[in-house]
Structure formats: C-alpha cells, structure tokens
C-alpha cells in the first residue's frame, strides 16, 4: 500500500511549515530500507529490549526540527535465538516463564525466542499505545509494497501533538516508524507512508503477494521491473 497522490498532496500541504524545507530520500543499505526524511537523519547505535527481555542490537535514524520529530528504529532479530538462549542460562532452576522450553515441539524455545520474534510487531505496537498522555485514534493492518504491518495514529492529550506510526517486520528486522508534529499541523502520515524496501544490491523492491516474516518469501519486482526470486 503506497499512495503517491496522497503522499504528494501532503508534501504540498507541509511546504509552508518550518520542517518542510528540504526533503531527503534516504536509503540505508545496511538496514535495507528507504524513506523520505525532512533532512539527513542522525544515526545512533543502541539496544532494544524485546517483550521477553532479550536485549537486541538496534539502530535509530532520526531528524528533529523544532517541535517536529521523525524517527525510524530498526531492531535486528536475526540472532534472537542465540541471544535468548544465553539469557536463559541466568534463569533460576525451574523458572519456565524465564527459561522457556527447548523441547522439539515447544512453542517458546529457549528464553522465549519464538514468541519474541513472532510477536515483535504486536509488542512494538502495544508499547507505542502505552506511552504517557498518548491517546490512540486509529489502529489497523497495513502494508507497504506488500510487507504487512500495523499503522497507529496517536494524539497527545496534553499538548495535542499528533503522531503517525507504522510497524513492520522484514527479513527478521523490526521497523518502528514514527512522525510527530505539533498541534495544528497536518498529520504526518507522509513519513511512514514513504518507506520502501531494498534488496542486497540496493534496488527498490515490491513483493507480488503479501510478505509475512518467517514464511517463504514471495516473488518480487525490482525497481527496473524485472521479476524473479528475491536474492
């Protein structure tokens, strides 16, 4: 789901605002995404604590202009199994809720790594909705270039600022995309709606059917229009 007409119209509405001075189509080959920022983002290495308390490597791309804030947090779940298993070693004996179950038919795995990765989008969505003074106005399913995710709109009940966010899981990486603007500004849907996905060669891709993380990847169409298996 990518709406170029709505996106372009929103940019025109924002053209007179203080943060809409120079738009940058930013691409991260390292994290395989593209997005339109209002300026070159600052990149910060950090960590992210998952629902079941595994500490994962993360990277934050951010732009702050006045009271407007734009941010993409990318959390790498690639090594969640090993990280959770290491965490589980410190659990008290018999504390299954901490250590998980390593049996072949277990739904948890060591340190609950299985529900951690499967529920990453839901957990990140819940965390957004639990922020102090933030009231959810909308929560729904969405997709961007056929990668499925959640879309959330929030209003701050104190200062009336608006946040438009989207959360996706692609290639075992969690993407939390947030745009926040002051009261009276157009809702910044344009930011999360401008996200795209890159292949190993840095080309923009669009899946031909819905992409579900953890399932076999659908065929893709690259920027040049060629079709074929994802490489």
Predicted regions and their residues:
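Hydrophobic helical h-region of N-terminal Sec-dependent signal peptides
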Residues: 6-13
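A structural detector for beta-sheet-dominated domains
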Residues: 27-29, 36-38, 44, 64, ...
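N-terminal signal peptide c-region/cleavage motif recognized by signal peptidases
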Residues: 15-17
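Surface-exposed amphipathic alpha-helical segments
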Residues: 29, 41, 94-97, 121-128, ...
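Positively charged n-region of N-terminal signal peptides that target proteins for export
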Residues: 1-4
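Short, solvent-exposed coil/turn segments at beta-strand boundaries
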Residues: 36-40, 65-67, 146-147, 168-175, ...
């Amino acid at each position: 789901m990518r709406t170029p007409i709505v996106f372009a119209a929103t940019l025109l509405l924002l053209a007179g605002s203080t943060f809409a001075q120079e738009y940058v189509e930013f691409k991260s080959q390292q994290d395989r995404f593209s997005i339109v920022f209002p300026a070159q983002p600052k990149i910060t290495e950090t960590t992210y604590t998952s629902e079941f308390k595994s500490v994962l490597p993360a990277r934050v791309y951010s732009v702050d202009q006045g009271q407007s804030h734009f941010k993409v947090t990318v959390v790498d779940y690639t090594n969640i199994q090993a990280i959770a298993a290491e965490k589980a070693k410190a659990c008290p004996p018999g504390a299954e809720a901490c250590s998980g179950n390593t049996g072949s038919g277990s739904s948890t795995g060591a340190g609950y790594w299985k529900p951690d990765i499967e529920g990453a989008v839901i957990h990140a969505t819940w965390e957004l909705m639990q922020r102090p003074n933030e009231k959810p106005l909308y929560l729904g399913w969405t997709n961007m270039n056929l990668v499925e995710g959640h879309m959330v709109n929030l209003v701050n009940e104190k200062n009336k600022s608006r946040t438009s966010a989207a959360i996706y899981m692609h290639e075992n990486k969690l993407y939390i995309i947030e745009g926040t603007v002051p009261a009276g500004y157009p809702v910044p849907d344009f930011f999360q709606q401008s996200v795209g996905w890159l292949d190993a060669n840095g080309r923009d891709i669009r899946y031909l059917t819905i992409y579900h993380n953890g399932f076999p990847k659908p065929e893709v169409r690259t920027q040049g229009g060629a079709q074929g298996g994802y490489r």
